[in-house]
Amino acid sequence: ADPSAKPVLMDNGFEYIPATIIKSSANTQHNYLIIDKGSEDGVVRNSGVITEKGVIGIVDAVSSHYSYAISFLNTELFISARLGESGAVGPLAWDGMSSDRAILKEIPLQFKFEPGDTVYTSGYSTIFPPDIPIGVAGESKIINGATNEIDVNLFQNHKALKYVTIVANRRAAEIESIEQQEEEQPKK
């Protein structure tokens, strides 16, 4: 992403804001990023941080000119991911050890997949748009006889990052508002 490029608002409601990482950690269980774009640039809390090779993190705090993001290389961060072009969805998280590996959990046993199948963002959150390629499926194991847990080899080298794109969902507040309205409705 060219950090001098202008933000772009897409039809899907996401604004894409080119940015540069100015500080990061990569050697702990709770890694973070400091990014050179803030509220004056259109960044809001819970914006996604991506590259063309995958998910990088989620913005957790914003000042006028900078953002603090929780890195995908953080054991407390889970994202909604989809296996294959039209496959099952489950939580994806860093494995806590290798900067190029993650684990996709809760994939039903009846879902068939092959090592090498691509893992994408699911689009089932207000943070990331759908269909961002994240990595490829590797080995798997069955958990409690009920679901698959799949190793994912990430496309993005998280230790060699400089340029990223912040994705701010301009429709997130509307989506969250309608969810809250439904939750407050008396149940029939």
Regions found by a protein language model. Give the residues of each.
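A secondary-structure micro-motif
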Residues: 2-188
